[in-house]
Amino acid sequence: GGDAIATDFFPLDVTDFGPTIRKIQAAKPDIVVSVLVGGAHMSFYRQWAAAGMKGEIPLASTTFGVGNEHRVLSEKESDGIIACYGYFEELNTPANRDFLGRLRARYGDRTPAVNELAMRSYDAFLLWAEAVRRAGTADRMAVIEVLESNISMTGPSGTVTIDAPTHHTIQDVYLGEVSGGAFKVLETYREQPPADTAAVCDLVANPTDTTMYDINVDL
């Protein structure tokens, strides 16, 4: 557990993070968590490194790498940043190596980087295709019925299972750290359920529920 001792929010066009970095230096927290996004916010990571903060206070993020920031920043600016996602392109598994090999064989020099968001979309298509195959039809309600039967498929990110009550997924989660401009996978957490959503949402018991829940996540 832990306590958040301060929180800052920034417009998407902000490029000067000096005041916030100075506040962090004064507060000396155990860790800093960034959810910054967009081109302007890349300045934070550059200024963080320039202020000598790398190695002083760990920096984690729930967004870093999704926009391929680690491929844009220098190693000096990005090495050591920690992120946790359901997929990293650097996963060293047979399924992922096969997927990337086929992707590169098809697109060659035009092969795009594959991040968490891209893989989630790919997984969704694979799950839908498997549900259509099992249902024997593309009829919407028939496919939903199959999807709610805890259907699973195994792809580049690992095994992904639909959690019927939440319509979210049970999936492997990976903890990674940027090293040399790429993510190094430090830990693997198998078949993690959508526990936060499951605490408030059950679409099997309440199939017409359209509530937008405010989920509080304990630190």
Predicted regions and their residues:
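Extracytosolic ligand-binding ectodomains
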Residues: 1-219
